[in-house]
Structures are given as structure tokens and as C-alpha cells.
């Protein structure tokens, strides 16, 4: 084995297997491209993105970690979302972060 090498088993790995998925159309109404990362709480994304923010509450993009989706000005895209995992708390992404996403 080479130091740092990864040895994977046979077959494919499905990311976010078993996660509830939500599809939403998003359009960039601004005049510049907007890029949003994989683990951003989607409702807190750039204000130039037009979509149902209430429906997206508690969700992130269903894309691999460390990647992003780019929204070009005036272009609508259908995106797939999955629920944020872990402690489901969002802090500091905007001036009004929601904190705990689930009522307790």
C-alpha cells in the first residue's frame, strides 16, 4: 500500500442513501453568477436566488461534500435537496441564522 492511498471495495457508493429528497426550481434574478456550497442551509443562500425558501427550510443540496452549484443570471434550475443532518443547528451563515431547525 502507498501512504495516503485509498483502496475501495467493488460496486458503487450512493451518496445520501435513504435521505428524503425535495426538488425545487431556483432562478438567479441577479446580474451576476451565484455559487452555493454543498452544506449551506439553502434558505439562507444569496437573496438574488428566487425559490420557495419556506419549503427549503432545514435542507441542503443533494451533492457531494465540498462541491457547489452555480446559478447563472436569469437561468432557472431544478435542484434536489436533502435534510441537514447531525445536530440540525445552523449558526452564523447570515445575520439571522435560524439556530436549532427542529422544535424541541
Swiss-Prot record:
It is an enzyme of class 3 (hydrolase). The keyword Hydrolase applies. It catalyses: urea + 2 H2O + H(+) = hydrogencarbonate + 2 NH4(+). Keywords: Cytoplasm, Hydrolase. Its EC number is 3.5.1.5. One of its GO terms (molecular function) is urease activity. Its main location: cytoplasm. GO terms for cellular component: urease complex. Pathway: Nitrogen metabolism; urea degradation; CO(2) and NH(3) from urea (urease route): step 1/1. GO terms for biological process: urea catabolic process. It is found in: Cytoplasm. It comes from the Bacteria. HAMAP family: Urease_beta. Belongs to the urease beta subunit family. NCBIfam families: PRK13203.1, urease_beta. Heterotrimer of UreA (gamma), UreB (beta) and UreC (alpha) subunits. Three heterotrimers associate to form the active enzyme. This is Urease subunit beta. It comes from Mycolicibacterium vanbaalenii (strain DSM 7251 / JCM 13017 / BCRC 16820 / KCTC 9966 / NRRL B-24157 / PYR-1) (Mycobacterium vanbaalenii).
Amino acid at each position: 500500500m502507498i501512504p495516503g492511498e485509498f483502496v475501495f471495495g467493488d460496486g458503487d457508493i450512493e451518496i445520501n442513501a435513504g435521505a428524503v429528497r425535495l426538488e425545487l426550481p431556483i432562478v438567479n434574478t441577479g446580474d451576476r453568477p451565484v455559487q452555493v456550497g454543498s452544506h449551506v442551509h439553502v434558505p439562507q443562500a444569496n437573496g438574488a436566488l428566487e425559490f420557495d425558501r419556506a419549503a427549503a427550510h432545514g435542507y441542503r443540496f443533494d451533492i457531494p461534500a465540498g462541491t457547489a452549484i452555480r446559478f447563472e443570471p436569469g437561468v432557472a434550475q431544478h435542484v434536489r435537496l436533502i435534510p441537514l443532518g447531525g445536530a440540525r443547528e445552523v449558526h452564523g451563515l447570515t445575520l439571522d441564522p435560524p439556530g436549532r431547525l427542529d422544535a424541541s
